[in-house]
Amino acid sequence: MIIFTLRRILLLIVTLFLLTFVGFSLSYFTPHAPLQGASLWNAWVFWFNGLIHWDFGVSSINGQPIAEQLKEVFPATMELCILAFGFALIVGIPVGMIAGITRHKWQDNLINAIALLGFSIPVFWLALLLTLFCSLTLGWLPVSGRFDLLYEVKPITGFALIDAWLSDSPWRDEMIMSAIRHMILPVITLSVAPTTEVIRLMRISTIEVYDQNYVKAAATRGLSRFTILRRHVLHNALPPVIPRLGLQFSTMLTLAMITEMVFSWPGLGRWLINAIRQQDYAAISAGVMVCGSLVIIVNVISDILGAMANPLKHKEWYALR
């Protein structure tokens, strides 16, 4: 396990280093790039030194430090993605297991139909439908922002729920409820696609495990169905799914850009799209580096967690030697 972890960490370092060339190219080879006047080597050394010290330069649009802007928008996107990812796991894992143990029955067919429908709906269309019905027509939920305009929440961590909870305002409970109400529509919109994929992965894994002899032997010993599902099916069906969850998080980070634009969510995706519109290449380079690094780190962590849950995974390399 130690060798497997070290191998993944080395892969992480190499991949992040290669990613720096992508970010640097946006600051050097594009028209009106900030580093275009210097030689290639000197420009890369200067840019890489700034990257190490978390200095991405200043925006060509408003003159503000890009690092300060990232500190404001990055927590908003992470809060949205974490909540949506948690919702996808809470719903997708049990529903996928139900579909797996009831395969070819009406429960399985119904779950597959709903999952296929959710997977096929474009994110922007789903966001517009939820906005139309839940906000504009019924007036249940707000359509944009993170808080009501009545509340002024001091940014401490950048996470709306945590900042509202840490606030010493007498209206703290109302601030928390306002933050929750503003998150419901974006979280639902963002969680639909990964939820359907988790359902599909969990269904396939459950079917494979449910046909194993040790599951049938547990049933012949008189164990209850709940005990069999908890001890044998879930314990063995979940580890193969864990390494693939990193890809779902990466996909969700991409979908967050569209979600943030529709709901005017002040996050990294909306900030990056605005930078692309305004051709702010220094900001684009910083956004690409942050998003790419996050995707790589999450995938490596999911691989390591998958190997910890399934010891056979990190032995595959030795079996191929």
From Swiss-Prot:
Gene3D superfamilies: MetI-like. GO terms for cellular component: ATP-binding cassette (ABC) transporter complex, substrate-binding subunit-containing; membrane; plasma membrane. It comes from the Bacteria. Residues 74-302 form the ABC transmembrane type-1 domain. PROSITE patterns: ABC_TM1. Keywords: Cell inner membrane, Cell membrane, Membrane, Transmembrane, Transmembrane helix, Transport. Residues 30-80, 134-174, 270-280 are periplasmic. Disruption phenotype: Single mutation, decreased extracellular putrescine, in an sapBCDF operon deletion no change in resistance to antimicrobial peptide LL-37. Operon deletion has no effect on growth, but if the putrescine importer PuuP is also deleted then growth is slower. One of its GO terms (molecular function) is dipeptide transmembrane transporter activity. It is found in: Cell inner membrane. One of its GO terms (biological process) is peptide transport. The chain crosses the membrane at residues 9-29, 81-101, 113-133, 175-195, 249-269, 281-301. The keyword Transmembrane applies. Residues 1-8, 102-112, 196-248, 302-321 are cytoplasmic. PANTHER family: DIPEPTIDE TRANSPORT SYSTEM PERMEASE PROTEIN DPPB-RELATED (PTHR43163), PUTRESCINE EXPORT SYSTEM PERMEASE PROTEIN SAPB (PTHR43163:SF4). Part of a putrescine export transport system, does not play a role in resistance to antimicrobial peptides. This is Putrescine export system permease protein SapB. It comes from Escherichia coli (strain K12). The lineage of its organism: Bacteria, Pseudomonadati, Pseudomonadota, Gammaproteobacteria, Enterobacterales.
